[in-house]
């Protein structure tokens, strides 16, 4: 790599980045002609015509057209009294003369919050004497008397009426429940309908409305078919056959015995009904 001194013959008139000082101007003996001229004397060539009219400054034109002194300009936080009318004129225009109490306290009116100088005397006279309420003037005493006095009397009358009603309710005894004659109760207790089972059925029927009794069917269709077949051959069944049926149908000995008893009673009833039917109709 070549050194910087080898590449540059004259190093005294150059600025070296590695140096901590600048080369003084006396070392530069000669300067070009274009650097020695000042900006004011140096001619400048323009590509457009040089006979254009001179343009005035924008701020001077603005202040001159609007007749405002450019030296003072706009005051940023100065007093703005010249922009608004006087306070007295505003109060005079906003507030009319107050003549009555209703005008003194207008509802939802922004002018009620302004205090006019012409109305200070009437306001001071109105607020000067404080009434019995301690807050409102004496002019409101009549309204205070009618409002609070009337409400107190109404409340007292209401309490008196309630006390009278309460005392009358306590004085009148509650009517005793009517006692039913003993003659009706005894036959009901002695009758068979008043048993525990019948009473439960009555209460359940009364609570749930019309209720149909569920048909009891402890035997399946297959069991009933086999029992009916055995009953068709023999109305009475012996012990050996009963045990055989109970094992085959997965029933107890007592269940088979009870079924044959009920079936014989049913057959007897059917025979009786059949006999009665044919006796009433001899032609059949």
Swiss-Prot record:
Segments of the chain annotated as binding DNA: 212-271
Cell compartment(s), UniProt: Nucleus
Stored PROSITE patterns: HOMEOBOX_2
Compositional bias per record (Low complexity), positions renumbered to this chain: 189-198
BP GO terms, sorted: embryonic skeletal joint morphogenesis; regulation of transcription by RNA polymerase II
Annotated segments matching region Disordered: 163-214
Cross-referenced InterPro entries: DUF3528, HD, HD_metazoa, Homeodomain-like_sf
UniProt xrefs under SMART domains: HOX (SM00389)
One GO location term (cellular component): nucleus
Function: Sequence-specific transcription factor which is part of a developmental regulatory system that provides cells with specific positional identities on the anterior-posterior axis.
Family: Belongs to the Abd-B homeobox family.
Protein name: Homeobox protein Hox-A11a
Organism: Danio rerio
Higher taxonomy: Eukaryota, Metazoa, Chordata, Craniata, Vertebrata
Gene of this entry: hoxa11a
